[in-house]
Amino acid sequence: QREMKKKGIAVELARTVTATTPTGTGVSVEIGASPFVEVANPPAPRTLEADAVCVTVGRVPHTDGLGLDAAGVKVNARGWIEADDFLETSVPGVYAIGDVIGPRRIMLAHMAVAEAHTAVHNILHPEDRKAQRYDVVPSAIFTAPEIGDVGLSEAQAKQQGFAVKTSVFQFRELGK
């Protein structure tokens, strides 16, 4: 974020675009709190002025036709399958992994593979079930410079009672 800020690029976290309005010189963009990220103090809605807007496409659940209602598997209002921390659905013994469990989890292929391993473990070893961990998955945004993270933020670690020590490594010093 610091490197983006140096380049004059603002990074808005836990936000979503709620409206856009063309202006004579660009576009007015209204942003509000993201429906996909839970934060203690959601940022207040605000309006930004921009030269242009890059639109990215989200995901929708493809659960129609799976017979979830007949099986008794619950889905939320948006159609995502509801699963607990062990990836078990509302029907005991029925597990769900991958994109069908929705955007409150990490929707990437390598995460679905990890979820599959967890679900299979829980099916084969019901006496030793394991919760799927999402706090140790690396994340990256491929911009210049790149933005990435893994694990808890400093604030989250402090909130969970960890003794926190931080240090900084400048990626510009890393050979590519």
Model regions: which residues?
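FAD-site-proximal beta/loop scaffold in flavoenzymes
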Residues: 11, 38, 46-126
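Conserved beta-strand-loop-beta-strand element in the redox core of flavoprotein oxidoreductases
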Residues: 21-47, 53
